[in-house]
Amino acid sequence: MEGEIYQSLILGYPNIISYETTKTIIDQMEQNICKINIGNYQGTGFFCEIPFPDKNNMLPVFITNNHIINEKILYDENPEIEIEIKFDGIKKLNLKDRYKYTNKEYDITIIEIKITDEITNFLQLDDNIINNIINNENKNEVYINKTLYIIQYPGGNLSVSYGTLENIIKEEKGTFFHKCSTKGGSSGSPILNLNNKIIGIHRQGLNNNSNKGTFLNFPIKEFIELNYPDYNLRQYNKKYGKYLDSLSCEKINIIYGKLGDEGFKHLCELKFTNLKEMTIPNIGITSIKPLEQMKLDKLEVLGLCDNIIPDITPLSKVNMKELKLLDLSSMNISDISVFEKVNFEKLEKLNFGYNNISDISVLEKVNFKELKELDFHNNFISDIKVLENVHFEKLEILNFNMNKITDINILDNVQFKFLRQLLLNNNNISDVKKFNKVKFRKLEKLELKNNNLSYEQIKYIFANLKSKFFK
């Protein structure tokens, strides 16, 4: 039956070889190719591995045309596509939280494949294409007049077509003409050489029996640059690093990029001598040990929030004597005892929000002479008695929102003469008998919402406190 279906497809397409000849190729490749269903429209896509960012780190991806999966589909609020793989049937891929890239000029879309997708068969790029990507070269002339083939889903059925690469269109970056016969549904098919390695993707059939394709090295390089924040640093250091004595950069700001531990290690190996700010939230790192090798004696701002780094002990081995702002929020931290060993005498703002901290006894052992803002919101702190022995003479904002505090009477022994804001919302506070003795003469804002306090207790507090005003 398959042979009959196949023969009915090839009428009028002389470069499509016989069913018997192609069956071996189809049997080998059918798990690497898939049919894409977008409404009533069908196309082809394929699975392959690409350097990310080099040969030592290959990333499995899914590739098709931009005119099949475009920006609207890719970045939809709930992006999902339906693909059909022979023997595996129909799979639905949710495209959220993946590396992805699409480009109308190249007519290509590249999407990361994850382990949970349960796709295990991947085509390989031709070595010349990989070298072009890694070395930023364009040596694609070697494919001119070479025999190629496409494995595709014309009319929704798997087939193979042979042809040659005619020429490269210099006016359209990465574009070439090929003679492999195609039909409706072939869009997004891989173009391979006789070594079964991919060189490009089929884009469009033309009226003159020629077809357009795109070399994969150009879009894959852009995919890496977009999704691997460390890529440009790697390329720069690879080319010039051995000649550099120092980098005078003052600011590093990588927002929500997936740098990862390997990329972070490489970043820390660069020779920064004048770095004043490093903000790297949610970049996928799990250790800050690489900071130990950096020269950070001029650093004033360090933001590490939204990375899962429970162990912050390496901070004790980093010289950051000029540090003024340290953001350690949302990092799964429970132990902050390392602060007994750090020397942050100029620190003004310290944020521990959204962690698992319950013990803050180390605060009586630290020397933060310039600290103005201390944030412990959303932790598991129940005992704040240590504040009696803390001397943060310049503290202006103290945030204990969303903790487990029950007793705040100890605050009558606390000397924060410049405190302007005291935030205690969403705790379990019930005892405020001694709170009328608190002497926060600069206090402007006191918040006690969502505690176990009666109206009379709250009235008692505000009636006895002599501050400027409360908001």
Regions found by a protein language model. Give the residues of each.
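LRR N-terminal entry segment and analogous cap-like coil->beta motifs
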Residues: 232-287, 296, 300-305
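Protease-domain processing segments flanking chymotrypsin-fold serine proteases, especially trypsin-like
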Residues: 1-56
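A structural signal for leucine-rich repeat
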Residues: 264-271, 288-296, 312-320, 336-344, ...
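Catalytic nucleophile loop of clan PA
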Residues: 46, 166, 181-203
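C-terminal cap/linker of serine protease catalytic domains
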Residues: 203-232
